[in-house]
């Protein structure tokens, strides 16, 4: 069979062979193809008979063409090509007809298999024909094969996915059950832990109450012990003071006797020496005076003769001098003339020399015969003549020169003679002046002689008196020698004591070194433990963060699982509803079955009755009845079969309902699976695209990353599990370490306190040793005082020591520290802090022994202690508050420096100069002590070295006066005991910048205060709600006869450095607050006032209060009062009467402790207040608004023999 393409190829071949007729062939082919198409369209609508006719027609035409070709063999190529095209068109038409016939014969099943439907048969046949014509192939593909195969594959995949989903659901159910079980276990564990923690807190509370009771018992026991010890100490101190005062009195008396003896012996020796010298002088002066009188008479006569002779010689010499001067003038004139003449002769000489030279030249020329002129010879002869003349003149010149020399010699001799005469005249004038002086001296010596006679008579009388005194002194010297022997024995004992003290100081130094090394080691350990604690704390914080993240994840899982459970419960409820409906249907069906059974029973009864009736009726109705029975039995059988069918149908219905439910569930699951599979397909497509891109090298694969992340997460989860277990152990270890740390901190604080005590003791011992060495040296020096020194006597400079207090209004706001309450740290540290604070309270030793209440605060402070351990009450109040009232003020001029004279004894004044400085708010107080002789006559001697300068220092020091007051006045709380004012010495040292007991936020003075004198034991203070004891104090500047050399440590007053000790007999007192004043206070004006009282004015009442409020671990911020501040210095003499002090209110003594966090909730009342914690041995803490409007300081000078008057002044405690 040929195709249209083959015809095209043949046409193309023809075209290649003969290119010209190809256009005609193509055109003919196109026309033939169009005719063929038209024929196709027409023949589609015709019958088979018509199609055969056309075929015959085509055969006829072809036969005719063949005949023509046979006939005309000689045709041209164009004709042949045309014939071929016609033949091909016919062939094409034949093929079209064949195709049409084939399409008409195609079955409808083939069309349905090919196109999927068979309804528009003609249309489908036309499409099939056109497809065969277009493709020229028989299309035998079936449309349903591929979908069926795809459906089979889908079914298999659906079964597999269904199986997988069931497995996944089972796994999810297992995981859900496991998580629910774990959550229940965690709940149980949490409840157990909370119960245990509650039990533990209850135990801790019981332990705390028990420890509180123990502490109260210990406090009472310690208070008793301390009271007994205080009584013993006071007794011992009193005895010590008495013994020392007795020893000092003995030493002072010995020194006084020695000095008096030395002074008297020196006086006697000086007087005897003066007597002898004056007697010798008198004898020598009398003999000299006689000789001088005779010499004076002779000298007067000689002087008169010499004066007359000197006057004559003077006149003669003046005349000679006049003659010599005139002769000299004449000689000088001659000399001038001769010098002129000599100059002329010198010029002629030069001319002659020139002429001689010329003559010589001429002679040489003549000798040579050069010039034989007669003229030259004549000139030579002339020159010779002139030379002869000049030679004659030379002789005259030499004569004149000799005369001149002789004249010069004479002149020199005359001048020498005149100089000698002048010298003699000057000597005579000097001798005249000396003689006049001698006359004056003789006149003076006469007056002195008369005075010496008078003095001699006086000295004779004095010698008689001194001889009498010598006898008295000899008797006293014998007594002093006995006292010296006694004192030598005392010196030996003191030396032994000194050696013992030195050995003890060496031991103390060694102990101090060991303590320093131990403290350094402890500090290193504490630093190491702190570092480890910080590291462990950081780890704990990281782990807690991880735990929090895990808890968040668990919460998320919980929420998801709750949602799933909610969905499952909802589905279960729906299934239960369906079950109920099915049960109702089944009940209805059972009712219908029961009805049918009842009908069957009725039919059986009817049958029985019928059989009975049959037996009765007999044989009459046998035939029709048998027929009826048969019919009835058949009906019964039919009914039974129907019943069985109904039962089967009922069972089938039940099954179908169950299957329907299952199918519904499967449909839903399949829908979910289909959605999930579609998502998976999309993801797979996305992954395939990614994989393709990865293969191309464009995108990095995420599977490896996901796998790596998954592995990392698994490893992290394992690590977290291990870390959670390790954390639990570490938490216990950290609890133990915190216990150890708190114990170490407590031990470190105790060691520091002990170290400070030891340092203070060492300093006190060093001061005592220095004082003892000074006393020994002084005793040695005063024992040798009888021997006279270079100056003839030994003087002792005695310093005047005094004490006083300046009051200063310094009010501070309580520094409140609020730290954020962290849940984890509280849960880890609550028990440790409670135990550590209890241990700290138990282990602390009292550092300061100045008063009883400093070591043991009153019972009212325990109310604040009970509140302080609650963790949320972290606000601490600490700050000084001073309430002061106005002091007395007298009229004086504070602007000018005043000088006050206070008499420790009548006749020996003590000068005190007060110089205020208004710019710096300071005042300088200069005290000048009297001379040694005056001091010895007035008071006892305090032995110091002669070259030492007195240091006078005024510091604040508290005093205790138990006073009763009404309960309405005591609103500020219990008071604390104050130590009395004492004489002090300062040792300057650097204050540490950071420490437990240092105040960092305010200016501190680099002064350590050491007391020198002690006072009576402080009164016991009993605090009750009815009556509170109030401290009252009054500052005194005292000059005491006792030598107080035993210093005891006093607490450091770093609150204000207002007093500066200097070495130049001056006291610099700061007037007013040292801190910066607020604009309000500066606006009102601050005026320092210095009040100087007259001698015979009685002391007015002064009321002032003050407390030292300090906390060793807290910062203090001072705030001055907003009211007017004035400073006064009041100086009163001995004759003033004792002042009465009124009651005042002081602040509560307490110290701030570090509050400990616990989980016990606090009440609203406790939240409202701010607790103040008091601990024994710590500082004071309170907060009050300052009421001070004035500050006053009183300086009172007293004599040693004054009556025991108790004077109290306001000051800071």
From Swiss-Prot:
GO terms for biological process: cerebral cortex development; corpus callosum development; modification of postsynaptic structure; neuron migration; protein localization to actin cytoskeleton. By acting through a filamin-A/F-actin axis, it controls the start of neocortical cell migration from the ventricular zone. May be able to induce the degradation of filamin-A. InterPro entries: Cortactin-Actin_Reg, Cortactin-binding_p2_N. Residues 61-70 have a biased composition (Basic and acidic residues). PANTHER family: FILAMIN-A-INTERACTING PROTEIN 1, FILAMIN/GPBP-INTERACTING PROTEIN. The gene is FILIP1. This is Filamin-A-interacting protein 1. It is linked to Neuromuscular disorder, congenital, with dysmorphic facies: An autosomal recessive neuromuscular disorder characterized by multiple congenital joint contractures, hypotonia, muscle weakness, and facial dysmorphism. Patients may also exhibit motor delay, speech delay, impaired intellectual development, and abnormal brain imaging. Keywords: Coiled coil, Cytoplasm, Cytoskeleton, Disease variant, Phosphoprotein. It comes from Homo sapiens (Human). Residues 880-894, 960-970, 1139-1156 have a biased composition (Polar residues). Interacts with FLNA. Interacts with RHOD (in GTP-bound form). It is found in: Cytoplasm, Cytoskeleton. One of its GO terms (cellular component) is plasma membrane. It holds the Pfam family CortBP2. The keyword Phosphoprotein applies. Belongs to the FILIP1 family. Residues 1-70, 878-900, 949-976, 1103-1213 are annotated as: Disordered. Moderately expressed in adult heart and brain. Weakly expressed in lung, skeletal muscle, ovary, testis, kidney, and fetal brain, and hardly detectable in liver, pancreas, spleen, and fetal liver. Within brain, moderate expression is found in amygdala and caudate nucleus. Expressed in skin fibroblasts.
């Amino acid at each position: 069979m040929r195709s249209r393409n083959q015809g095209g190829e043949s046409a193309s071949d023809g075209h290649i062979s003969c290119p010209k007729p190809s256009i005609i062939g193509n055109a003919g082919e196109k026309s033939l193809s169009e005719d063929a198409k038209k024929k196709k369209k027409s023949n589609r609508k015709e019958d088979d008979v018509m199609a055969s006719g056309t075929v015959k027609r085509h055969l006829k035409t072809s036969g005719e063409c063949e005949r023509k070709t046979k006939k005309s063999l000689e045709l041209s190529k164009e004709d042949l090509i045309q014939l071929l095209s016609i033949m091909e068109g016919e062939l094409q038409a034949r093929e079209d007809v064949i195709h049409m016939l084939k399409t008409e014969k195609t079955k409808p099943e083939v069309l349905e298999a090919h196109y999927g439907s068979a309804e528009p048969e003609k249309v489908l046949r036309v499409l099939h024909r056109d497809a065969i014509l277009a493709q020229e192939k028989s299309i035998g593909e079936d449309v349903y094969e591929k979908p069926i195969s795809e459906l089979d594959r889908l079914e298999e995949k659906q079964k597999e996915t269904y199986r997988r989903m069931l497995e996944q659901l089972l796994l999810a159910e297992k995981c859900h059950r496991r998580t629910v079980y774990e959550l229940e276990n965690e709940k149980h564990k949490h409840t157990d832990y909370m119960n245990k923690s509650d039990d533990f807190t209850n135990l801790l509370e019981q332990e705390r109450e028990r420890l509180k009771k123990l502490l109260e018992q210990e406090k009472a026991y310690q208070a008793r012990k301390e009271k007994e010890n205080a009584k013993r100490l006071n007794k011992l101190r009193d005895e010590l003071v008495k013994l020392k005062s007795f020893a000092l009195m003995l030493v002072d008396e010995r020194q006084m006797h020695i000095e008096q003896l030395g002074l008297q012996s020196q006086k006697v020796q000086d007087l005897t020496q003066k007597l002898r010298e004056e007697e010798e002088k008198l004898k020598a002066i009398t003999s000299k005076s006689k000789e001088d009188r005779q010499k004076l008479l002779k000298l007067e006569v000689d002087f008169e003769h010499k004066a007359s002779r000197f006057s004559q010689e003077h006149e003669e010499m003046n005349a000679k001098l006049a003659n010599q001067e005139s002769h000299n003038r004449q000689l000088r004139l001659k000399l001038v003339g001769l010098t002129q003449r000599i100059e002329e002769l010198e010029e002629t000489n030069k001319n002659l020399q020139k002429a001689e030279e010329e003559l010589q030249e001429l002679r040489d020329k003549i000798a040579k015969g050069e010039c034989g002129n007669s003229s030259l010879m004549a000139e030579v002869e002339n020159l010779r003549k002139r030379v002869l003349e000049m030679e004659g003149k030379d002789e005259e010149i030499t004569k004149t020169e000799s005369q001149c020399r002789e004249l010069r010699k004479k002149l020199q001799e005359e001048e020498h003679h005149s100089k000698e005469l002048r010298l003699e005249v000057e000597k005579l004038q000097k001798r005249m002046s000396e003689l006049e002086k001698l006359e004056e001296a003789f006149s003076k010596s006469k007056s002195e002689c008369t005075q010496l006679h008078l003095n001699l008579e006086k000295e004779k009388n004095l010698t008689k008196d001194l001889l009498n005194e010598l006898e008295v002194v000899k008797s006293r010297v014998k007594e002093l020698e006995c006292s010296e022997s006694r004192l030598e024995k005392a010196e030996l004992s003191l030396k032994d004591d000194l050696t013992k003290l030195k050995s003890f100081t060496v031991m103390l130094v060694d102990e101090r070194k060991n303590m320093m090394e131990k403290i350094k080691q402890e500090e290193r350990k504490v630093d190491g433990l702190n570092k480890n604690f910080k590291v462990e704390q950081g780890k704990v914080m990281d782990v807690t963060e991880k735990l929090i993240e895990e808890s968040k994840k668990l919460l998320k899982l919980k929420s998801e699982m709750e949602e799933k459970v909610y969905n499952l419960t909802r589905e279960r409820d729906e299934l239960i509803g369906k079950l109920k409906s099915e049960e109702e249907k089944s009940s209805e069906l059972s009712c219908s079955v029961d009805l049918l059974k009842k009908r069957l029973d009725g039919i059986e009864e009817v049958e029985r009755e019928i059989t009975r009736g049959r037996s009765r009726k007999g044989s009459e109705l046998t035939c029709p009845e048998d027929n009826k029975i048969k019919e009835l039995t058949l009906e019964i059988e039919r009914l039974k079969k129907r019943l069985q069918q109904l039962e089967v149908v009922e069972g089938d219905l039940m099954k179908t309902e169950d299957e329907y439910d299952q199918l519904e569930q499967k449909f839903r699951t399949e829908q979910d699976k289909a959605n999930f599979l579609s998502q998976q397909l999309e993801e797979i497509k996305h992954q395939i695209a990614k994989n393709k891109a990865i293969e191309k090298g464009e995108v990095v694969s995420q599977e490896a990353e996901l796998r790596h992340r998954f592995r990392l997460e698994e490893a992290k989860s394992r690590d977290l599990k291990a870390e959670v277990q390790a954390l639990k152990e570490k938490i216990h270890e950290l609890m133990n370490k915190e216990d150890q740390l708190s114990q170490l901190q407590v031990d470190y604080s105790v060691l520091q306190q002990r170290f400070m005590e030891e340092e203070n003791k060492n300093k006190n011992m060093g001061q005592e040793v220095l004082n003892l060495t000074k006393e020994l040296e002084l005793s040695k020096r005063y024992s040798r005082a009888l021997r006279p020194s270079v100056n003839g006597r030994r003087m002792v400079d005695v310093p005047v020591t005094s004490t006083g207090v300046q009051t200063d209004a310094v009010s501070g706001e309580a520094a409140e520290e609020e730290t954020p309450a962290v849940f984890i740290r509280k849960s880890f540290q609550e028990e440790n802090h409670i135990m550590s604070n209890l241990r700290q309270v138990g282990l602390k030793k009292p550092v300061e022994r100045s008063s009883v209440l400093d070591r043991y605060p009153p019972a009212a402070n325990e109310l604040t202690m009970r509140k302080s351990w609650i963790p949320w009450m972290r606000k601490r109040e600490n700050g000084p508050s001073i309430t002061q009232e106005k002091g007395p003020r007298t009229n004086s001029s504070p602007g000018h420096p005043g000088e006050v004279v206070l008499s420790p004894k009548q006749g020996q004044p003590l000068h005190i100069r007060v110089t205020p400085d208004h710019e710096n708010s300071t005042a300088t107080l200069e005290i000048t002590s009297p001379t040694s002789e005056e001091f010895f006559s007035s008071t006892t001697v305090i032995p110091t070295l002669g070259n030492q300068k007195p240091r006078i220092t005024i510091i604040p020091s508290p005093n205790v006066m138990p006073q009763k007051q009404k309960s309405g006045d005591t609103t500020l709380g219990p008071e604390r005991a104050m130590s009395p004012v004492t004489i002090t010495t300062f040792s300057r040292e650097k204050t540490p910048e950071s420490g437990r007991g240092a105040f960092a936020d305010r200016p501190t003075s680099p002064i350590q205060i050491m007391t020198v004198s002690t006072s009576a034991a402080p009164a016991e203070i009993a605090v009750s709600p009815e009556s509170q004891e109030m401290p009252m104090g009054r500052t005194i500047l005292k000059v005491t006869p006792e030598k107080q050399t035993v210093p005891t440590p006093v607490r450091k007053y770093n609150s204000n450095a207002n007093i500066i000790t200097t070495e130049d007999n001056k006291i610099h007192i700061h007037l007013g607050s040292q801190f910066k004043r607020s604009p309000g206070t500066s606006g009102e004006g601050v005026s320092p006032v210095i009040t100087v009282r007259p001698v015979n004015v009685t002391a007015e009442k002064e009321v002032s209060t003050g407390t030292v409020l300090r906390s060793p671990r807290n910062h203090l911020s001072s705030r001055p009062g907003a009211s007017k501040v004035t400073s006064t210095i009041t100086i009163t003499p001995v004759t003033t009467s004792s002042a009465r002090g009124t009651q005042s209110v002081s602040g509560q003594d307490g110290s701030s402790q570090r509050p400990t966090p616990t989980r016990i909730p606090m009440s609203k009342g406790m939240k409202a207040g701010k607790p103040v914690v008091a601990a024994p041995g710590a500082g004071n803490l309170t907060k009050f608004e300052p009421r001070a409007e004035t500050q006053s300081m009183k300086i009172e000078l007293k004599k040693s023999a004054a009556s025991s008057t108790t004077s109290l002044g306001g000051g800071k405690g």
